Amino acid sequence: MVRPANCNWLNYEGEIAIVIGKTARNIKMADAHHYIAGYTVANDYGLHDFRDTDSGSMLRVKGADTLCPVGPGVVTDWDFRNKGMRTIVNGEVRQDGSTEEMAWDMHYLVADMARLITLVPGDIILSGTPAYSRTVYPGDVVSVEVEGLGTLTNHIVSSPEPVSDEVGAQPTATEEVLSTALGGDWEFRGQRRPNSTQKEALPYPLVRPRYES
């Protein structure tokens, strides 16, 4: 993972990647498994220095070169129910969750996306991440482990080149950026925490859809 030289707030997000195997459009949730080729591990890194600019779209935050690695391979026969998933930084567990804790299951995600977007073979949908996404730095080693899918490991390095300041928005370190990148740790810095924009603050349903196979 390459962090631009003039950026500071690169966060990990251990996730599961759903790999589409057949063209899907307006499908039923109960049929979604027929359109899934398999699953693999993903790390949906976010470059939150651009959070202010990209609020709502995440184009720069999530779309920079080298971000969102997936692997090590696609597992075709995997039951996603009640599987453990962890993110480990330099040997220390930072995220520790289970697929049972997800707001929506994999079949729901596929059916939801296919309502308005035609999914084609090779498309990837990410599952969302457990709590405690935090910033990593050059020299760190980040691994995402998902039970039954394997381990995805990345080394964080700094690019010798900064983001160009000739055009476009520049990296920032506003309260919005810091509250997202540092999460709950922002409170321990003795600072006022602004209104949360974290995923856990979104209006997830109190009752999750039942798994369907």
Language model features: what each stretch is:
Residues 28-40:
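Short Gly/aromatic-enriched secondary-structure transition segments
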Residues 2-10, 24-31, 57-62, 74-77:
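A generic local secondary-structure boundary/capping motif
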Residues 1, 8-16, 37-38, 66:
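Generic beta-strand structural signal
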